[in-house]
Curated annotation (Swiss-Prot):
Top-level taxonomic group: Viruses
Family note: Belongs to the herpesviridae glycoprotein N family.
Gene Ontology cellular component list: host cell Golgi apparatus; host cell membrane; membrane; viral envelope; virion membrane
Pfam assignment, any one: UL73_N
Main location: virion
Span of the signal peptide: 1-21
Membrane topology recorded in Swiss-Prot or TrEMBL: Single-pass type I membrane protein
Statement: the UniProt record of this protein carries the keyword Signal: yes
Annotated source species: Human cytomegalovirus (strain AD169)
Protein name per the record: Envelope glycoprotein N
Matches recorded under InterPro entries: Cytomegalovirus_glycopN_N (IPR021003), Herpes_glycoprotein_N_domain (IPR005211), HSV_GN (IPR034707)
Subcellular location(s) per record: Virion membrane; Host membrane; Host Golgi apparatus, Host trans-Golgi network
Amino acid sequence: MEWNTLVLGLLVLSVVAESSGNNSSTSTSATTSKSSASVSTTKLTTVATTSATTTTTTTLSTTSTKLSSTTHDPNVMRRHANDDFYKAHCTSHMYELSLSSFAAWWTMLNALILMGAFCIVLRHCCFQNFTATTTKGY
């Protein structure tokens, strides 16, 4: 708030200094201060008329507007009927092997491919070693 007061004071001084040489002047300035909670707009209008009598009119209007925020619904995901996340009562059926899902079949297929590749590489290495030792005549 001190920053707005300082800017407002500088505007008033500049308008008064500017209007001292003229017979009539009007100056309008607007400053905007933004924060995460609200937007505050200050508008200063100064009218100075120089004649036999000096009349100075200063009008200050301030408008504050609260920024819109999104609402957060904490119940986006509903709990399951059998949910006991913090009190997990494990039963034996939780550890049974199941082939009823695609993930189980995919994992088993990957394991078979990996074992097959390992056997092929192992056979190749052993065969190379066997042929290398037998060709020398040992």
